Amino acid sequence: FSMLDAEFACILYDAKEDTFIAARDPIGIRPLYYGYDPNGTILFASEPKNLIGLVAQILPFPPGHYYKDEVFYCYCDIAAVKSYHKQDMETVCCNIREKLIAGVQKRLVADAKVGFLLSGGLDSSLVCAIAARESSKPIQTFAIGMSEDAIDLKYARQVADFIGSDHTEVIISREMVLDALETVVELLGTFDITTIRASIGMYLVCKYIHENTDIRVLLTGEISDELFGYKYTDFAPSADAFQKEAQKRIQELHMYDVLRADRCISVNSLEARVPFGDLDFVKYVMAIDPEMKLNKYGKGKYLLRHAFEGLGYLPDDILWREKAAFSDAVGHSMVDYLKAFAEKYFTDAEFEAENLEYDHARPFTKESLLYRELFEKYYPNQSQMIIDFWMPNKDWEGCNVNDPSARVLSNYGASGK
């Protein structure tokens, strides 16, 4: 399996020997779950809901592992680094550019029509800009927002005009957001706050694409943050701390961002492809000296930005734009609607009483309690599927916040407000 350059979850059965091997790709881009029935027999499923009632505890199959003869074996720890590259910044940035371009090129090969999610942020904009250069005709891009003046719609429109894409804007309402909430929790099998927030917009835009186009493959910009840093990693106290945080985020991706991307896209009969998750690209970036990845330049993700600087891929104000989180950039009002709905859903007394029912990943806001109760409706007593709420590293100064959104950080840029 270590020789495969692919996104996969599989079970291979040898009928002659009556044996099988189960395996999952190193990042966990494709879903796979397992559990043991009352007789101790291991059961597998691509969706956790298929194991409800069959096993006592449902767990995600560990990425980069295969299972054979009752034992899990690690064939690839994608986040592990034996030694860092001994290269100067220009060489590193050149390699970043070439490897990301190669990652996009691989994922343009398809026997079905390919489309692109374009948020207007750095990551999805780079994927679209590279693809536009590689394509002989305009690519099809899609953006979503709560209103026509949503932050990212403005920037996505600017990128689309610059790269000459066939661009579609999907405008969603408060009612659409609230109506989709329970569906999103069920299809993802999560109670995580930021995953659910971001998934609603992605689910709705993918639903639109499925119902209104013949596109069947979608490229997205996930996994860049884990590699190059979030807004909160600006507060990393050292290069070693930055690297350890990046390793943790990569190892847990299958419970958060790539879970969102796969499920929201796949449930709408589309195939998710993630260029930033290209194995060669991930391995290379993880082995860059973390001293170079610290925000010492006044901008996060400096290496990624500099790699494409001055080459005409993107306008400077997009290439150097401050980050706006996807769930925020869809429209600040979306998160506000969800919070307001949760505030009315529970009284203060109900919140104080009901959150105590949970020991693992105890809800700490009315919004998180709402998501947890929806989760328990479909996945009773299965909270161990998610290790905890995705949150900034609270051990770092400046990161002890009570919300996963970058909006609450002191270094959140003006373009995201």
Residue ranges of each PLM-predicted region?
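Conserved catalytic micro-motifs used in adenylation/nucleotidyl-transfer and phosphoryl/amide-
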Residues: F1-C74, L126-C128, L218
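ATP-dependent adenylate-handling active sites, centered on carboxylate activation for C-N bond formation
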Residues: A15-I21, P26-N39, V81-G312, F326-F341, ...
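A short alpha-helix-loop-beta-strand transition element characteristic
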Residues: Q57-P60, L314-E322
